[in-house]
């Protein structure tokens, strides 16, 4: 019964629940540990990793590991083995054990057992704990002693423990190195044992002398033991040691290339290729032109496709790095052939048409990278040959639905998209080829080709209206085929149609898609297509799809979510018909859009749940609403120039008051207010950007574009009306159009550049303020609104999930109770935190450090008898902590010299690997009550009593007594 309760706790409890639940789960598991049945004990032990995952704070983990240590000490070998597995699975939580000495003491007691299996399990347990006890001399001694054991199980466990301690302890590695060398070179050591001892040498990299001795020993082993098994283990250990010591990588590359070229055994060649690929990933900058040349010669002359594939994979890894640049940029004085005639290019060209598809895929990858790095005079011919190789591979693989063919096709299409980024003049012919091939390709290949088409068309407007007929016919054909990839193919084809239509779907396209979706598509496919329509700006069609889906969901939260999306699409559709110069229609359209947005934000709020608060979505929509309101107000302000023009004496008033803005009349004040409002909106967009740590790059770029549009409007107001002399728009530059990666971004950039040109021309020709200036402002508003808003992926889907959970100590016994502290003492506030990830941690960015900001504010006023020193009103402390295994801990010393209740806030933000700070939260608060220390209180009371006991002076005579 107790274990079922524990399982329910661990399966149903979510992040952020109360500490009581963690203690309850631990108590239930403790009951299982104390059970008389071995099965229940084992089941309780194996549930501990889930407990650590749900409640990853040191207090609970320390208690749990102490209980596991007791089971390890008192249980049988099977229970010990279960505890060992739990420890190895929970390696990232080991540093949270507070009582390390007590934990190790209980575990280490088993090392004195007469049972060699128990000793072996203990050694493996100690090896698993090496990260927290690297310098324990008793553990070092036990490992040395067990290496001389006559029991094979114990010796293997000692080797495992020795390898673990060697990787963490410099002293242990230096001390054990000679013993390991003697055992490896000893004639009485079996070959099987030598094969297990040799990999230990890869950890002897703590200093140069130790690494040099290990390398000399490995070099001797390579010469003395040329057998295949021994040579493979020795060479791989050689590579691992070089990877850690770094300075020996060039020598190791030469050694591996030597064995690849000269050793006839395929197993040795495969191992050499495997290690060369490892070194290519680790240190591509250390590969010389000669190294790559030797590898190319080996690949050209080998008769085995498997070995050629391996060598090409190494070259493929190097092709995207600086190594290729070094290959085509020899040192001064070197006489090298033209790039087109090098062995690397010959090899890549030869492999592009190889019968083995995997070899051909790597050949295409290498050739694509060469075309990007090659000198200008050679690049044209290489570009054409590369595209021809891609096209032949696409033709070959598009009709084969095997996994190998599809993987090759994906590689070829990825290379094609990359190639067309740098060579846009080749886009049209490549797109035409893909469209022709779509008719005869299999469904899995069609999905990949449609995705490639969408990626190419997003970068370049190559899908013209004449191609829509072929795409619609493909959509009709796809709906009649029943295959596993049918639904995915419908989504991919619809995406290509949206890109080709450029946010203006014709009635025929809508009718065809709608009819086919009604016939064969399931609800999820319809939702995916609607989502793509929202991303591409086809809001009219997405509104219809969301409306049809509202009644097909089983949860009211999903209903409100779809209803909000429908309202947002309706709102954006209201803005799609704007025309230049029609300002009254623009006002009406914005008003209708705001009505739909207000309905949508109400539904969006109803769709949020505690586990899915939809924070980004709500804030993004609120900003959109406020932006539309600000744009509407700006048009009204511009129109006020007609209804309330500047008075005739405006210039005189401006000269007498010294304010140049007065020459424009009342419109200047309104424009100043609008400019400040748009700058405030830009700052809010910047805050939204900084709080979206898990967002994909396209979503962040979209938020940045919205921010830049607000800055652009504020700049136009300042440049045309407020202060033309000092106005500047540094936040935007013309270089942005070169870096644009989507059609939406290209259109926004075009509008920005056009507006900036108009403003510059107008400000030079006409002095402010005139109808030309207000007309330019209104035209800017309409130009921005005419571009359909793109709802990017993060609005619908979170691919990366990162959250931080904080724990503060001391903590109050009850939530509303303040922590008492005397005013002459300082409070030590300990802040602990864990970083929790979703299924794809670090997909877009990784956390390098956590920034903790602690501040305190006085909540209640102190008594009138106490003076408040100004410097002691608040605590403001900031500290950066680098997390280790997703855990961090630090302490703050806070001063509360002022009596009263203080509110202490701890806010966390993260710094990614690029050094950018993100305001992710959370923000925890705790109340602290500053009390007067007893000694000062006693002195104050004594002083008050003395003042009360002093006799009062005689009262003065009143006026009546004076005249008596």
Curated annotation (Swiss-Prot):
Region described as Disordered: spans on this chain: 937-964
Keywords linked to the UniProt accession: Chromosome, Cytoplasm, Developmental protein, DNA damage, Nucleus
Disruption phenotype: Fishes have a defective lens structure and abnormally shaped jaw and neurocranium.
Subcellular location: Nucleus; Chromosome; Cytoplasm
Signal peptide: none
Nucleus as UniProt keyword: yes
Low complexity composition-biased segments: 937-958
GO cellular component: chromosome; cytoplasm; INTAC complex; integrator complex; nucleus
Major location category of this protein: nucleus
Single GO BP term: snRNA 3'-end processing
Xref: PANTHER family: C1ORF73 PROTEIN, INTEGRATOR COMPLEX SUBUNIT 7
Family to which the UniProt record says this protein belongs: Belongs to the Integrator subunit 7 family.
Subunit: Component of the Integrator complex, composed of core subunits INTS1, INTS2, INTS3, INTS4, INTS5, INTS6, INTS7, INTS8, INTS9/RC74, INTS10, INTS11/CPSF3L, INTS12, INTS13, INTS14 and INTS15. The core complex associates with protein phosphatase 2A subunits PPP2CA and PPP2R1A, to form the Integrator-PP2A (INTAC) complex.
Function field: Component of the integrator complex, a multiprotein complex that terminates RNA polymerase II (Pol II) transcription in the promoter-proximal region of genes.
Name of the protein in its database record: Integrator complex subunit 7
Underlying gene: ints7
